[in-house]
């Protein structure tokens, strides 16, 4: 049996140096046209530190929540300009993406059960592509292997986010949308990009407080998973479409956005440690195979969506990519992506959270299917 080890704490001065290096890398990335450079730079720097120093770095909730609000607002802005008929047009691509995701997640869970002899509970929660932190919490409730679920979920998230800049550049070149190409690869004026509008800042504060108040008031009747993503998007669309709130208030800019991207990058890269990778070294080939299958199936689904419904290949891939929802939405915003990305990704998160809520029944079903047959009398 593997002995659990407590993650080492990170000295404050280490965090300062890592942040400084990450900011410099991000500013350089912006100059050369790397999309969502703050996510990529912070993921790379903090990820390397977490692995080689064997120190886990996880942003606290009080820091993660504002970042989630900022990114949710960024991605809700395009939805406010959509007519109802256009939203209905997203139904078929969304359905196709969800079906492919569920099939691949099911096969991945089956593979972990059969090949690595993981329990059904651990396998299901480790492979559901959506809401990594929620799956880790569920693993404790279902007595699954929380360490394995954490490793698999955040390894998938790290790989997906780390490969996004390459896929954005590659698929932009293959696409036919000049806007997407310029958005994905255009160089930025670093100084001008630091300008932060007071409207966007106020919008983030109001949105965050509104979601917080709503969850507190309704807690006795029901709870909403990922509220600072789902409710922020819902409330902002209602505010603009029905209440006439100017769009500037749901469009954060400048330092506010860069800080949110940096926090998401730390979350994606700082969770994996050398100790965690060493503990499950034998399972890594299967885990990486599962991640590769997820990315490959997303590319296949993206090709079908692009050909059948006329979207760019980049938008279709960002809509179907499995996991790292905040990072994916950030890259979609940076590349001038179609609202399809937000619609499909949000629906994927909702679908995975619903499946996660029924995880005990799913685990029970898989357990019965793989239970040893009773001995013959």
Residue positions per predicted region:
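Membrane-interface helix termini and inter-helical loops of multi-pass transporters
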Residues: 81-89, 173-196, 244-252, 276-279, ...
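Cytoplasmic-side transmembrane-helix entry/capping segments in multi-pass membrane proteins
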Residues: 59-72, 91-96, 117-128, 151-154, ...
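Alpha-helical membrane segments and immediately flanking helix-loop junctions
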Residues: 115-155, 311-346
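Long hydrophobic alpha-helical segments that form multi-pass transmembrane helix bundles
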Residues: 157-210
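Membrane-interface capping segments at transmembrane-helix boundaries
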Residues: 114, 277, 361-375
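Structural signature of multi-pass alpha-helical membrane transport proteins
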Residues: 2-63, 70-83, 104, 196-276, ...
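Membrane-embedded alpha-helical segments of transport systems
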Residues: 101, 130-135, 150-172, 325-327, ...
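Short alpha-helical transmembrane interface motifs in multi-pass membrane proteins
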Residues: 10, 89-94, 117-121, 199, ...
